[in-house]
Amino acid sequence: MLLSLAATLSDALGWPLWTLYTLSVLVCSVMLLSLVSRAVGLSVAAATKKADAGFKGVEVPAGFAEFQRKYLAVFLVVMLADWMQGTNMWTLYDSYGVDIGTLFLTGFICSAVFSLFAGSLVDKFGRKRGCLLYCALEVVINVLEHYPTFEVLWVGRVMGGFSTCLLFSVFESWYVSAHRARKYPEELIEQTFSKATQGNGLAAVVAGLLAQVAADAAGEIGPFQAAIALTVVAAVLVAMFFDENYGDQRAQDQSLSQSFTQGLQTLKSPPVMLVAMGGTFYEGATYTFVFMWVPVMIGLVGASVPTPSAISYWLPGVLTQQ
């Protein structure tokens, strides 16, 4: 019965049978893990109740729920657009016949370099402007992905390095400042970020499915076109929901060299250094796995079987956020 159902879905969707089998195995694995978790008293429901218990003594001010929903709406649309781009990037560059490793490495290096001053620049010129700048950069980057020229794609990867710094700093910074400016309880910041993390995991899964639909409709460039539309929606939401806020005035008065020196002093603390090294090694291993995932999958499948679909590409992305 299950085999016939899978065959029917395969014919209806036009996807290889093995992708549906893989998805079925993943779903069954999640269900099995859920049952095991319940057996040992660590179910998702129990964990949620435990987390909510920490907020029972906190009075939720009027207007906070709406404020939180607006932020989460922006954040999740932005993350959905970002996840959409990762599904077919390797296969798109492969179809162009360009140096894939150099393009990926360019993005990683630029992200590391820009992270030294991106935060201070955003604090000075405004977090809302930083969010809008991120959206503008992402639209331009995804437009550049349409051109099968190494130089154009390289420029896009440089811009992508800067936009990545903004993605993982400016939105959260805006929320914390806006939250405190409204005098909301500090404990509710943790609640918001907890919901954002859970929603981000769901967005990664949904992005894989949507990317497959977009790729079926428009080819390898399809997910990037969908990401443009989602990013435009995110920019509109930022313009509607966000007000402007800035970083600490004392930090703004510091020069770049002073901020860099202060950062080095912080890194001299053994606990901070250990955390930084652990994060560096973990991220390095994870991104190596992500980069090698697609070519390994293609090699395993072989030329006689259809190329792995975007459904299989979201798994490495989900792993990177754990």
Identify what each model region corresponds to.
Residues 9-20, 213-229, 303-313:
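A membrane-interface helix-boundary motif in multi-pass transporters
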Residues 2-75:
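Cytosolic juxtamembrane N-terminal segment immediately preceding the first transmembrane helix
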Residues 126-127, 148-149, 219-220, 302:
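A helix-boundary/kink motif common to multi-pass secondary transporters
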Residues 92-102, 296-312:
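Short extramembrane helix-to-coil loop segments that connect adjacent transmembrane helices in Major
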Residues 47-65, 243-276:
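Juxtamembrane intracellular "pre-TM" segments in multi-pass secondary transporters
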